């Protein structure tokens, strides 16, 4: 959500931003806000004028009574009563206008960074750089679900009977590697100076509305029936939500937090879930990182955060690349975002494993989060988030890139301490 004053003073900039995101249907929203804002400001001005007139009349009534001019005083009292009735009407209108404006403003996308490439959708995202040499295997690599089955490591049929498509049982060595990766990710981020957090796995509707657009909520979030609670789609939501309605002391910035949590998603978007596999599913686990910082520090943190993901994946011998998200691929709250994609030797292409985003002050504004500066003035912080790792999707890249021709999977050195020194796993 952008600043109302900015929209009022720069409507053409806001409209061009909407066009750059290929959301032309939202263009009328800008004029709607401007019209409602003008009406609200006129209402506020009239209310202020009436209050001033009321105060003036009240003083005059006292003077008239002191002079014995009772009839004139009574007439003025009637005038004050009429003004009071009108003032009550105006005061009732104010919150109505503000709520109408707020709801429309929530639908207007954030102003994207000037460095973001203009493009309609993810097909126009731009490769920035690669890290590690892509593997071209001399043997056939099975589809990941089939590969996991060779280690007795997955049961999709059982999960389908229990919960339907989009769920899984991981077992044995595959499950152990999953747990080892998450433990390693936790320690990796702690060593980067982040505070480890175990957050709530449910959030109130007001927090969900504060961290994402309504469209994203509808496509992603599971609501608890009869409760004002949603299952989190990522722990970013509950970690950022921790600071809602709070005044943060500037000297405590940056806030750098990392957490591991289950994530629950409807996946109602264009891709949907897989019939068989663990690439796009309803339930998974993820190590996340968030930063709350001064606006001027945000881009430095953005670059640090995505580089942490690259470093993490490279330590597991997985080649990756950075992909700059174009304007049309950015969610409405995002100022700038990039994906980290892992190499799939089986498919001979990259696929998304991490997403790093600078949200500007949008989440802070929605959640009423403020910072008290050293000079005593209040301002909105910037919020950023990034995936460290999200198994089991990451396991696809892990197994494919560490698979040998004899069917064994090599355990990278970084992971061995979390697997009791194990150096490889073998087919069952």
How should each PLM-predicted stretch be described?
Residues 1-134, 149, 153:
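N-terminal alpha-helical targeting/anchoring segments
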Residues 27, 130-428:
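TRNA-recognition modules of translation machinery and tRNA-sensing kinases, especially anticodon-binding
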